[in-house]
Amino acid sequence: FLDMGMFPVFPGLAEPPSNSRPKICILSSGYMLGRAHDVYKKLIEDKYEATVVDVWKVKPLDLQHFSRTVAPYDILVTLEEQTLSGGFGSAICELITDGSLKKSVLRIGLPEKYIFENGNREHLLNTNGLSVEEIYEKIVKFHRCQK
């Protein structure tokens, strides 16, 4: 969005979720915010309680601010366009552990493998498990396991 001159504001963060189903908070930054927002719209259409948080500063992470932000949510989903080991999702998991927060975490990112394929960003993300539909399906499957 930022590369298109838009600064998105995602609804839901300021309002505590209301029902007893596990609530979903998608944490992302940069380019993947667009995909996070598209997934968010699908989740809302299908009656899931969800929000998207732009973690615009990945490091250092502030435990107090983070704790307040994610307090109403049961499931945290980290969405990144790099490999999972040592990435954004790992930093979030460390913060959750260090703060003794009780949250279920689903990390979504690129697989830990060499990608020997050429193409633009959209093509490479879509062919490596980061299409909007695949992200949505991973979240819904994880959500079902948390009930």
Region spans (language model):
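Thiamine diphosphate
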Residues: 1-147
